[in-house]
Amino acid sequence: MVGRNSAIAAGVCGALFIGYCIYFDRKRRSDPNFKNRLRERRKKQKLAKERAGLSKLPDLKDAEAVQKFFLEEIQLGEELLAQGEYEKGVDHLTNAIAVCGQPQQLLQVLQQTLPPPVFQMLLTKLPTISQRIVSAQSLAEDDVE
């Protein structure tokens, strides 16, 4: 008796779930603005993610904060590369290079220690990260004025 009631309850729940899936899919397909709203939502999430990355940048006028940020980014980048997460590791290394006082020397060291494909990935990401840091710094200066 109990097993039969459980089976009926499971069947009803399964039917309700499938019905909801069909309803949602039909609603999604018939909405002409669904794709536009989805694109806008993804764009907002991407912008929020970029802003979150910029918000953790130190004040470039504070040498101690820059040094701490530099060391943290180098350490985190090395750890992520060791774990095989090359994209994230390269992102952190490019952040460190962008705030480094002597980026050419750091690039030479990284060229000797990193595998060539990872170093090429680093070189391709470096201009965009540097540009974001420059724009973030100019935004911070605009906020002060």
From Swiss-Prot:
- Residues bearing the modification Phosphoserine: S135, S138
Where does this protein reside within or beyond the cell?
Answer: Mitochondrion outer membrane
Q: Which GO terms describe its molecular function?
A: mitochondrion targeting sequence binding; protein-transporting ATPase activity; unfolded protein binding
Q: Which InterPro entries match?
A: MAS20, MAS20_rcpt_metazoan, Tom20_dom_sf
UniProt keyword Membrane, yes or no: yes
Q: Which Pfam families match?
A: MAS20 (PF02064)
Report whether Ligase shows up as a keyword of the record. Answer: no
Q: How is it modified after translation?
A: Ubiquitinated by PRKN during mitophagy, leading to its degradation and enhancement of mitophagy. Deubiquitinated by USP30.
- Give the primary localization class: mitochondrion
State the protein's name: Mitochondrial import receptor subunit TOM20 homolog
- Which organism is this protein's natural source? Homo sapiens (Human)
